[in-house]
Amino acid sequence: MIRKQNFNIPGAKGRGMLMDLTYDDTNKFAPLIIFAHGFKGFKDWGTHNLLAQYFAEHGFRFLKFNFSHNGTTTDKPLDFTNLIAFADNTFTIELEDLNAVINFAWNGSSMPAASTIYLIGHSMGGGISIIKTAEDVRIKKLVTMASISGFSNLWPKKAEEQWRLQGMMYVHNARTKQEMPLKVTLLHDLDKNQARLNIAAQAALVTQPWLIVHGDADTSVPLTHAEELKAAQPHAELLVIPGGDHTFGASHPWLNSTLPAPLMQFCEKVLQFLSNN
């Protein structure tokens, strides 16, 4: 039977991170997939629970989590109610969060220890996952979906000067209609950690098997990002999904009980990739 177990662990700056593990109770020691959501995302967005169900039904455990500063709270995990935390977020914070999640899974204090860990990262979570994979031998395989090839691609370059002057920039959330604040500390993080946070440079250091998946209809993060990642790491495998947008046909809320066709194509390819030795 497919079951779900919930956890709450401390992330960066001690801020709580909600997580859930979806698994088949007849296969409690199955290989573990850790899923990292993207910018303005959260673990229960749209089709993420169906994604977890799919992989649990096909021989994997699936652990997804909310980054500590993604703007949600442990009380309201579906809404961006903590914009103060969102404003304080940095890429280094997200790397610290992901490390905490991997440590939690690896140590096995609250769940059967994971000796085989795979990462799936979406959009900005893809960039974070690339860096983490380059740094951490515990990660055996990497899958990126609609990943960015550079963090500075998340905002207009022309906005940086004003951002540095004012100390704050606001990004519009088309779904919630919120204006979400970002402190200039995000830019300072890039300034101080240029080598570590250079996604393309880190991509070149990834030695683990890596599947890059991108839709050719992605208007948020164009296909050129995937091509740049492939150029940085020629050993990676690139899959282009025809008609796939940034979320592979998914939206929030997702009221259907089945995955959209582009996302199902993604799942089938990832299943094949992770199942091959």
Question: Model-found features: residue ranges?
Answer:
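Short, surface-exposed "cap/lid" segments of acyl-processing enzymes
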Residues: 26-71
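Alpha/beta-hydrolase active-site loop
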Residues: 84-109
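N-terminal cap/lid segment of alpha/beta-hydrolase-fold proteins
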Residues: 1-27
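Short alpha-helix in the alpha/beta-hydrolase fold that links the catalytic acid
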Residues: 48, 208, 222-231, 253
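Acidic catalytic loop of the alpha/beta-hydrolase fold
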Residues: 217-221, 246
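Primarily recognizes the serine-hydrolase "nucleophile elbow" in alpha/beta-hydrolase
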Residues: 101-163
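Catalytic active-site module of serine/aspartate enzymes centered on a nucleophile-bearing elbow/loop
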Residues: 244-277
